Amino acid sequence: MKTLENNFLYLVVLGGRAEKANIELHDVRWVVGSKIEDTYDTLRKDWFGSSRGLHIDSYKKIQYIDGYKINLINVENHKIEKSN
């Protein structure tokens, strides 16, 4: 497994429009990148609404949760076992 030392986990709140919506809509996404700008293509691709007017309302680099450090590891080519 490869550690992603220069990448970080970001929690992002997106805002934008969607067809038939009368107000701005929001979505929350988790993305990985070395800086927030590296995540823009993924965020655009995953947005369900119109790309016109899509914007980031807020984001946070997540490095620690409840006293635990977040380490990103690439498991793309490894089987992940489900725990019961």
What are these regions (language model features)?
Residues 47-84:
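Short, mixed-charge low-complexity intrinsically disordered segments
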Residues 17-19, 36, 67:
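Generic structural motif
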Residues 13-14, 31, 65:
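Intrinsically disordered, low-complexity segments enriched in small/polar residues
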